[in-house]
Amino acid sequence: MPTINQLIRKGREQVVYKSTAPALKECPQKRGVCTRVYTTTPKKPNSALRKVARVRLTNGIEVTSYIPGIGHNLQEHSVVLVRGGRVKDLPGVRYHIVRGALDSAGVQNRNRGRSKYGTKRPKK
């Protein structure tokens, strides 16, 4: 435990918070334009073709972001909304595209967890 004198001389060191999504610059989401839409394979124990997009954000930073859900309508020059959130089995993918916002359509025929995939409520 430090003495009063030591605290006066040095003070307490502030804990520096490191952002998990630095390209968003402390914003909850950012708009961007898709520069490339492609599929990639995950890390070792898993096997799939994961849909990802390279997105140039409005602040000029280019990031790789994941396209969640089954099927998508994105192509080059699509305007998308990007949020933070990494994909554990895709190295370098630290962002998600928000479905149902801007040019990204919601997932078709989805009944559960609709809000996460931008799907409207089905008609009775």
Swiss-Prot record:
The modification 3-methylthioaspartic acid is found at D89. The gene is rpsL. Residues 104-124 are annotated as: Disordered. GO terms for cellular component: small ribosomal subunit. Coiled coil: none annotated. NCBIfam families: rpsL_bact. With S4 and S5 plays an important role in translational accuracy. The lineage of its organism: Bacteria, Bacillati, Bacillota, Clostridia, Eubacteriales. PROSITE patterns: RIBOSOMAL_S12 (PS00055). This is Small ribosomal subunit protein uS12. Keywords: Methylation, Ribonucleoprotein, Ribosomal protein, RNA-binding, rRNA-binding, tRNA-binding.
